[in-house]
Amino acid sequence: MRVLKFGGTSLANPERFSQAAKLIEQAHLEEQAAGVLSAPAKITNHLVALSEKAALNQSTDTHFNEAIEIFYNIINGLHTENNQFDLNGTKALIDAEFVQIKGLLEEIRQAGKVEDAVKATIDCRGEKLSIAMMKAWFEARGYSVHIVDPVKQLLAKGGYLESSVEIEESTKRVDAANIAKDKVVLMAGFTAGNEKGELVLLGRNGSDYSAACLAACLGASVCEIWTDVDGVYTCDPRLVPDARLLPTLSYREAMELSYFGAKVIHPRTIGPLLPQNIPCVIKNTGNPSAPGSIIDGNVKSESLQVKGITNLDNLAMFNVSGPGMQGMVGMASRVFSAMSGAGISVILITQSSSEYSISFCVPVKSAEVAKTVLETEFANELNEHQLEPIEVIKDLSIISVVGDGMKQAKGIAARFFSALAQANISIVAIAQGSSERSISAVVPQNKAIEAVKATHQALFNNKKVVDMFLVGVGGVGGELIEQVKRQKEYLAKKNVEIRVCAIANSNRMLLDENGLNLEDWKNDLENATQPSDFDVLLSFIKLHHVVNPVFVDCTSAESVAGLYARALKEGFHVVTPNKKANTRELVYYNELRQNAQASQHKFLYETNVGAGLPVIENLQNLLAAGDELEYFEGILSGSLSFIFGKLEEGLSLSEVTALAREKGFTEPDPRDDLSGQDVARKLLILAREAGIELELSDVEVEGVLPKGFSDGKSADEFMAMLPQLDEEFKTRVATAKAEGKVLRYVGKISEGKCKVSIVAVDLNNPLYKVKDGENALAFYTRYYQPIPLLLRGYGAGNAVTAAGIFADILRTLQH
């Protein structure tokens, strides 16, 4: 005998209902089959709402009519498929049931409340009608059907709304029915009968449990749970798209997973199957050829030490603590006896080794009752201050990692908690079962999905993912996108994926939580309708529970730089070539670092100085190793390196500036380069890295241009005026040459001060040969002197700058 149970989604419409029927038929043709059915999807919700609204004397018409319509739709479809289906007879049964429901609703209205026995009678009508429709389907195809009446044949103990089946007595009753071998067996799920013969329920979503009980009573070869997914996954595939299907699980693994929130199987399903070692197979009604997941006692050890990650939401944690608990016998017993007496299920328990406190979780719906019960139980201790006031923390979730292999495996807990820490998720409490089959962490509910994603990434997925949010798509930003596209396959081989989830310019932005299609990103951005808005980005990462978001600023805007502190606080890493943030007032500079440290996220700005050259990282490493910066000089502008190199070759200032502008070495308005302010910012950043606390206004700057030159003029007008300075620079170049020197635009840090100026350097100076757009940075330190640590290379250009940003983005994975 095979038992097949079908859930509501598998019976939701005529097509799915027929598919379920055919699967029962196919099983019956191979060996006798029993079908256990839930109510069609949405029906139980409607029925529950009917009694609730009737008790409040509210209209029930909408729920009543929608429920009937679902049944009518199914039977009409089944009749269309097979005109032998007894449409009129089945419709009459449905109508009769709803007439009875209407009568019960009227009684509820009169009483102003709903008794549990009446509620149970209404709530289970969906299952009863599923059986009526399935019986008609089989009879239309010439089969003889045996209906197992769960009220008469499954003995249960407990309340009207949640009871447990007595398998031994129920087996005797089922055996006494002498079910003929040729009959298709059908039974409504969710229901049983108490010792008085009254209808009772097995708890919401209890049809899985019903099927397991029937399988145990029949001594079935297998209990198949047919649902709308391919089996049991390592976590909810709706939360983590790359969750893995588990081919096998042990009974105990399945019980732990279902207890802590896995939705595929009801927590009590395994209990009746385990004593007889009846396998439980989870299958997909919509994909019956898929192998599914097998749960039994014969699971062999396999590579997966962890089988699943679950989240159980809507919990409250109670902390009972105080000096009166230390060494006092029976305190824990009193706590949990009080909970048991109030009918409150305790889900997780943790106790400090000092015996000073006990913490436990209950469903949040039970929190108020639990608090009242505890305060009553410990009234004397609370009054005498032997106990502190009962603390209740609401809106919590339990994240659990489950697997039989965890007992032998090392480092699972470390990876679990490390993943939560890296996702900036605070842990409220921790518990581990004595079997070492599961580890649980209590976290804020608004972080639960991020916790599942981060934990799954750490335990199951070697692939590291960066979710990139790019602001600024000019030369550098556009080149960065192209590099990301080019490197996709290479990074995939290294198990790294960069998903560009947002692209924004000053006006509009594109968003996609799964990563944008970058093939035609420019055109897509041009046609985007979403205005650029940082608040939308923040809402986006919270809505989609992004685990590793990286905010990349490729603008030079002060306004965007002003967002970094908030971005770090809200959970972004920040990567930027924009120098404005690091050269703002020291208060903001320090705030950025404090926020990065507090949120355990990275603020990376290697390209602030030297574009793709590893300047910042090398300086930080030197200082971390105990070195000290004593003196610095460097050429920090690629455009001015080019310009002064060409002056040396004999070109005039106006000629070389026009050439640099044409080649794109300068800003569209070359005065931005010639003012020296960009070099001043870079020099200030280096000084601050070395621990020198200066403001931008403290940097002494000698610009290339005289003060006031071309003020109020356009860029083109400025270029027309520039020849006025040619003779002066020709003279300065000649004077330097006569002394065996060349002119360079140099930034210096000395004795706690910063200066940017035009300097004549001789052949012995490391900056003498630096030109053609190269940068060179000479660090004289305690360790590096008299010969400095010299970093030299091209420090300008979209490609090298984008490559430096790319490297910083990848460094966030070392988080």
Swiss-Prot record:
Name of the protein in its database record: Bifunctional aspartokinase/homoserine dehydrogenase
Region feature Aspartokinase, mapped onto this chain: 1-249
Subunit description: Homotetramer.
Documented EC number(s): 2.7.2.4, 1.1.1.3
Residue numbers binding Na(+): E606, V609, A611, L613
Organism: Haemophilus influenzae (strain ATCC 51907 / DSM 11121 / KW20 / Rd)
GO function terms (MF aspect): aspartate kinase activity; ATP binding; homoserine dehydrogenase activity; metal ion binding; NAD+ binding; NADP binding
Keyword ATP-binding: yes
Bound cofactor: record note: A sodium ion is seen in the structure; a metal ion may subtly affect the relative position of the nucleotide-binding region to influence enzyme activity, and could increase the stability of the enzyme.
Residue sites binding NADP(+) per the record: V476, T555, K579, G664, E667, G797
Catalytic activity: L-homoserine + NADP(+) = L-aspartate 4-semialdehyde + NADPH + H(+); L-homoserine + NAD(+) = L-aspartate 4-semialdehyde + NADH + H(+); L-aspartate + ATP = 4-phospho-L-aspartate + ADP
Binding residues annotated for NAD(+), in chain numbering: V473, G475, V476, A504, T555, G797
